Amino acid sequence: ALWLPPAYKGIGGAADVGYGVYDMYDLGEFDQKESVRTKYGTKEQYLQAVQQLRKSGIQVYADTVLNHRMGADQAEPCRATPYRRGDRLHPKGTMREILAYTGFSFPGRAGVHSTFQWHWQHFDAVDYDHSNPGERDTVYLLEGKSFDDEVSQEFGNFAYLMGCDLDCQHPEVREELARWGRWYLDNTGVDGFRLDAIKHIAAWFFPEWLDALEKHAGKDLFVVGEYWVN
């Protein structure tokens, strides 16, 4: 078997190794983030590689980053409570309005493959207030949200890692991630997934997501999760 790196467009365009996820429907097909190709090539090249590997009897596992998004297209005003990055249990201030880059409209893709757009309501935390750039080392918990349960207990709660942290408790988020997974299986033919940064995502989410994909595929999928501990 062969584990291939994240194949979709990241915030760094052709230089992004894939973990700064911008658009999971762009496998090197659209002019976004100043590049059509990803670091690993075009969509056509990726699909050809997967096809040839499978023809040779080699299973292919796709690196999959479900934890966060980065490189939003629009800033959105929202309210949030600040926490120190090293302490997710005790707020360091009261809720206030911030300006967060949480609007993902993917103008370069223009609705091809999916019309879903991300907004602040689909995330639970960010780490930068563009109206207050001097405030660093801060995690902003968005209004009405909570840090995911069933995650690593480092820093009291290690649900937040980077970028715009997906709110897996939001039904639209779960539906969209399942929709993307089905699309990815149909379009690439991969045999399974390597799930990135699972200690930052609620453990209860994965059985639901995998069940939806395996029902769609009509078979068991090989899945392994990355859980990094210092």
Each model region followed by its residue ranges:
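Aromatic-lined carbohydrate-binding/catalytic grooves of carbohydrate-active enzymes
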Residues: 2-40, 58, 209
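Short, solvent-exposed turn/loop segments enriched in Gly/Ser/Thr/Pro and often Arg
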Residues: 3-14, 64-73, 197-202, 225-229
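Short, mixed-charge, low-aromatic patches
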Residues: 3-6, 131-140, 159-169
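Active-site-proximal helices and loops of the catalytic beta/alpha 8
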Residues: 6, 19, 49-54, 58, ...
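Aromatic- and acidic-residue-enriched segments that line the glycan-binding/catalytic groove
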Residues: 12-27, 67-150
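The substrate-binding groove and active-site-proximal loops of carbohydrate-active enzymes
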Residues: 20-43, 71, 75, 126, ...
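Substrate-binding cleft of carbohydrate-active enzyme catalytic domains
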Residues: 38-72
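Active-site-adjacent "subsite" loops/lids of carbohydrate-active enzymes
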Residues: 81-82, 88, 142-182, 187, ...
